[in-house]
Amino acid sequence: MTQVRRWDSACQKLPDANLALISVAGEYAAELANQALDRNLNVMMFSDNVTLEDEIQLKTRAREKGLLVMGPDCGTSMIAATPLAFANVMPEGNIGVIGASGTGIQELCSQIALAGKRIFTRLVLAGAISAVKWAASVR
């Protein structure tokens, strides 16, 4: 596998990608997330310390483009039974879980799996306070 060091090189290497996982210092994360949205990529933002204003701007812009921004501070998700970042591999099934706390969702899904049920998708959208403030701002 060839390594890339620049954003444009990565996008050229994977032209069919539909998701960007961003893990940089929070002060730089919004700029990179906006670049991903410019390229019509969904965003999973592992970075924390992103301002609420940046989070609202990113999520509003993503919604307008029909895209998804998970995070900031999103360290785990699973989409269509594919684990992303720090996610446990779970038996594939038909249950979907959406929430604000990645570790909370991870624990819930582990308990569901231990009970013999199967998970299809789990999405972590943001920290609880940010998610509530964002939801209130877009009403």
Regions found by a protein language model. Give the residues of each.
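Catalytic-core regions of core metabolic enzymes
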Residues: 1-139
